Amino acid sequence: MRIMKMKWLFFLLAVLYGHLPFAHALEPYSGSRIFWDTASRRTVFSSVGYARIIELQDGRLMAVCESGGIKIAFSQDKGSTWGSATKIVSNPAGIRECVPDLIQLSDGTIIVAYNPRPTSPYSEERKFGIRCKRSTDGGRTWSDEIFVNDALHTFADGCWEPSMLELPSGELQLYFADEGPYTSNNDQQISLCRSMDGGQTWSQAQKICYRQGSRDGMPVPVLLKDESQIVVIIEDNGWGYGDFFPTTVRTSLQNNWHNNYWVNATDPNREKTLNFNFCPTATGCRALAHADHVQERGSSARDARRIQPDH
């Protein structure tokens, strides 16, 4: 009798499985892929967070991270070996310097931008902000700290995650997630500050995208290869999936976010980036995407990018 019950159980499971959407064969993905050589892994920094890397004009690699301030390191051999880390920004009392970004301008100037984050208990003189430092000698020496933007002094009304882009005109742009304008709710926009003198002085922040009731965040800008458009990839939790979704917002280089233009919720220049045709819902794609984001948030907490929910 027990054997018969087991046979019926396997039969029912087989029938059920055969009717599930994910049981059907999917056409193999034929697009491009990237394979990483895990044997090439090298340690650049130890016990740090939010590392970024670029190739400099002289062929060196330069990395930056947060670790009790902001640290940098260089490689002379395309990343096979790395020099000792150098701290270029120290944490002031009651403030953590976080989430650095770096860029080398066409004239060779290197700029590192970062995000001062006050620790609790909060006080009005310690604000969440964006700052930067410049080097005109290949990273050997660095300028004094340069002011870019301030939000408020509380975690709920801060600013976050700077990312930079240089335009062909020489204009330097710094994008960041910005809660400062929304003190009465939990909304967040992407803001932009501009520099016309290589990062020495900066304009006031302007809005470039915002979805009411949602939290546009984590901007990374690029100029398309044909130099026709500025595209900024963000995370957007307003698509109705119950979590953040990779999204692009864009403008033409000619417009360049001028004439009070910004991308709202219904603007055709706001686009989702994932194509579920390659990973149908039935295969668990959305669940996996959600899980990956949750895992990223856990990693963020572990590496001290932020000890509170993602922005």
Segments predicted by a language model, with ranges:
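C-terminal segment of classical bacterial N-terminal signal peptides
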Residues: 16-23
